[in-house]
Amino acid sequence: NAIFVPRPERKRREVMQIANTTMSSRSRNTTVLDTYNITDPEELETEYPFFESRVDNKERTVISNLRPFTLYRIDIHSCNHEAEKLGCSASNFVFARTMPAEGADDIPGPVTWEPRPENSIFLKWPEPENPNGLILMYEIKYGSQVEDQRECVSRQEYRKYGGAKLNRLNPGNYTARIQATSLSGNGSWTDPVFFYVQAKTTYENFIHLMIALPIAVLLIVGGLVIMLYVFHRKRNSSRLGNGVLYASVNPEYFSAADVYVPDEWEVAREKITMSRELGQGSFGMVYEGVAKGVVKDEPETRVAIKTVNEAASMRERIEFLNEASVMKEFNCHHVVRLLGVVSQGQPTLVIMELMTRGDLKSYLRSLRPEMENNPVLAPPSLSKMIQMAGEIADGMAYLNANKFVHRDLAARNCMVAEDFTVKIGDFGMTRDIYETDYYRKGGKGLLPVRWMSPESLKDGVFTTHSDVWSFGVVLWEIATLAEQPYQGLSNEQVLRFVMEGGLLDKPDNCPDMLFELMRMCWQYNPKMRPSFLEIISSVKDEMEAGFREVSFYYSEENKPPEPEELDLEPENMESVPLDPSASSASLPLPDRHSGHKAENGPGPGVLVLRASFDERQPYAHMNGGRKNERALPLPQSSTC
């Protein structure tokens, strides 16, 4: 329990006097190493030098006039008389503590007291002048004629106030004695000091009562008002779904059946069979099962069955059915399909298309080489990444064409089918599963800040342009096998970083073609981002043959316009990946190789006119680029 403070550099000096004389003359500057000195700032500020003494022709000596119960370090050198300084051996040292001195811990002077208001007094006493090591605390024993009480006062508290205050004393006569406690033990008790605590007058008691009574009445009334308000809120919440009012024919008998009207999507409960749990959804458990007659020309179909928790409020049950009603409007191969609803009876069920490989986030993480459950699947190639991106963009293009803004596009909300097709998942299903991906800003609802665009973070505006930004983050998740975006930043730091124009870094081993597509989606100006149809147009040549047969992009419902032919000289043309449009006014994508084809880029067939560097916008960092960087050419969008 000792600490050694290294001595400063010094020159050896000869001290011809005997050790006793040296120590007595400088006794207060001796090296002292108390076990508790590290807790006292004043002790740490004092530096104790070493003192030297020569002992001739002896193997023992006595050092006197040392401080009591104090730890010393003693160094011994063996020296040759003729060699003087150069003939000394290396030092051998020992630590030794002196014996405690009797009476050193006694408080030397008288104890005094001062009256203080509110039935309290202040005791003062002097410190022991040369205690045994270090004073640790003081103990006060005080009391009236009935019984004694004890109060402990630390050394730090004593040095701060110069004494101690005794509070909450009853009126009457008291005696008090004080004892110091050092490293070696307890000192003697002081002589008793007598003091008197006066009783409050009747007038003072009346004043205190007049002040306390109105305050107590106000607190009681305020508490009752708060209790009634909370009780009223809870009663309305349990009856009407967290305070949201819904029109009903008979409010006294309000249920989900009064709000949701069965239609052609209604499925008889006896046609549904549950087999096993798939996981927890935002409203309740999701099961795998079999449904009869929900798909044309299929007697039985494997389906996913969503349920509502038994403890769910009426509001949650209605939101559950409303989500199913939204899904009724969608009929796209790259959007998870609704197959039916069971609204009659309990629990309410929603029948969805079964996506056997789960959500895209979990699927991507299962492809990591270090995963134990990796079924010997290699990480996705560039062509597979582009295939995933095209399928997600096709589903989002369909939603955009139907005037639907997703607002929560992320890998966790995309689902993977048995044949590895990626589809836009049923909306809101994964909110509880990946709770850490969301952030509650300013007491509002949970927000997926790491996937949100700058305008959504600033103004709460969600459009198809903000969905395109989120699509770029999904591409980043695909390239990193579902790493968390903006690793190392808290949600609050991500808010500031994105709103100030910050972007995700290029993932390791990410193909240039995929990263350039991400940068297109991360233009700071929303109108400068490509549409989902433009994104599909830029990657359509890389898609598998089956994409043309099932996609919304090639369907009659979309009917994309024929691209205009460009009458340009071949020497003025170059192949640039992911060109967002076929207009002659298009600008090329940012390319770190000065206009050369990006690595792993698409084949020939996508041609644009290259703009010179001087023609590019000088303030590109305001539209998604970074400061102190080569100006970022901005792709032209048909939405401008």
Curated annotation (Swiss-Prot):
It is an enzyme of class 2 (transferase). The gene is IGF1R. The chain crosses the membrane at residues 209-232. The lineage of its organism: Eukaryota, Metazoa, Chordata, Craniata, Vertebrata. There is a cross-link at residues 441, 444 (Glycyl lysine isopeptide (Lys-Gly) (interchain with G-Cter in ubiquitin)). InterPro entries: FN3_dom, FN3_sf, Ig-like_fold, Kinase-like_dom_sf, Prot_kinase_dom, Protein_kinase_ATP_BS, RTK, Ser-Thr/Tyr_kinase_cat_dom. Residues 233-640 are cytoplasmic. This is Insulin-like growth factor 1 receptor. Residues 573-589 have a biased composition (Low complexity). Its EC number is 2.7.10.1. The modification Phosphotyrosine is found at residues 253, 434, 438-439. It catalyses: L-tyrosyl-[protein] + ATP = O-phospho-L-tyrosyl-[protein] + ADP + H(+). SUPFAM superfamilies: Fibronectin type III, Protein kinase-like (PK-like). It comes from Bos taurus (Bovine). GO terms for cellular component: axon; cytoplasm; insulin receptor complex; plasma membrane. Residues 14-208 are extracellular. Keywords: ATP-binding, Cell membrane, Cleavage on pair of basic residues, Disulfide bond, Glycoprotein, Isopeptide bond, Kinase, Membrane, Nucleotide-binding, Phosphoprotein, Receptor, Repeat, Transferase, Transmembrane, Transmembrane helix, Tyrosine-protein kinase, Ubl conjugation. Residues 590-599 have a biased composition (Basic and acidic residues). It is a single-pass type I membrane protein. Residues 563-572 have a biased composition (Acidic residues). The modification Phosphoserine is found at residues 551, 555. Belongs to the protein kinase superfamily. Tyr protein kinase family. Insulin receptor subfamily.
